[in-house]
A protein has these predicted regions:
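Flexible, nucleotide-binding loop/lid elements of kinase catalytic cores
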Residues: 47, 122, 154-156
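Mid/C-terminal beta-alpha module of Rossmann-like enzyme folds, strongest
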Residues: 149-171
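Activation segment of eukaryotic-like protein kinases
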Residues: 111-117
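N-terminal Rossmann-like NAD(P)+-binding domain of SDR-like oxidoreductases, especially those catalyzing
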Residues: 1-96, 116, 126, 138, ...
C-alpha cells in the first residue's frame, strides 16, 4: 500500500496539496470535487456507516497517515466552503472495483483476484467476519457526476449500501 511507503508525502498531499488546490479553485471560482474515502471512518463501530457517523480512527496506527490526511482534506474543504463560499463537493468513496485494478494495491478484492489467477488459496486475515461493501467503477463514476452536478455540499458516501463478510466473499 503506497501510503505505508511514503507516509510524510501522504500527509503533505492531505495538507499542503489540498490547501493549494482549494486556493486555486477559489481564485478561479471553480467548483471542486474532493475524492475522500470510507477510511475516514477508521475501524467503524457502526455498520453500515452513514455520513453523520464520526468514525473510530487511530491517528498513530498503521493506517493513521492516510485516514488523517483524508479527514484533514475534508475539514479544510468544508472550511473553504463555509468561510470563502467555495462550491465544494466531498465524495467518500468505498471499495471500488473494475477493469485495470492494480492486483497488488493491498485491498481484498484485487488480492483475491490475483491469488485466484495464480491458482493460489485465498488469504483471509482474521476470522473472515470483517465486512466490506463493493462498488463497481461505473456506478462510482455515475455517483461522482451526480454529486458534482448537485447543490449538496456535505460529504456523501458513494458505494454499495450492502456489506458482505470477507469469509462469505471468499466462498
Amino acid at each position: 500500500i503506497d501510503y505505508l511507503k511514503i507516509p510524510i508525502q501522504t500527509l503533505k498531499v492531505g495538507s499542503l496539496g489540498i490547501h493549494n488546490l482549494l486556493g486555486l479553485a477559489k481564485v478561479k471560482k471553480a467548483r471542486l470535487l474532493i475524492a475522500s474515502t470510507s477510511e475516514v471512518y477508521g475501524d467503524p463501530t457502526v455498520h453500515p456507516q452513514t455520513e453523520d457517523y464520526w468514525g473510530n480512527v487511530n491517528p498513530v496506527g498503521p493506517r493513521g497517515v492516510y485516514d488523517e490526511a483524508k479527514r484533514f482534506q475534508e475539514a479544510m474543504t468544508m472550511a473553504y466552503h463555509t468561510y470563502h463560499g467555495l462550491e465544494t463537493r466531498i465524495a467518500r468513496i468505498f471499495n471500488t472495483y473494475g477493469p485495470r485494478m492494480r492486483l497488488n494495491d493491498g485491498r481484498v478484492l484485487p488480492a483475491f483476484i490475483g491469488q485466484a489467477l495464480r491458482g493460489e488459496d485465498l488469504t483471509i486475515f482474521g476470522d473472515g467476519s470483517q465486512t466490506r461493501s463493493f462498488c463497481y467503477v461505473d456506478d462510482l463514476v455515475d455517483g461522482l457526476f451526480r454529486l458534482l452536478m448537485s447543490d449538496y455540499a456535505q460529504p456523501v458516501n458513494i458505494g454499495n449500501p450492502d456489506e458482505i463478510s470477507i469469509g462469505e466473499f471468499a466462498e
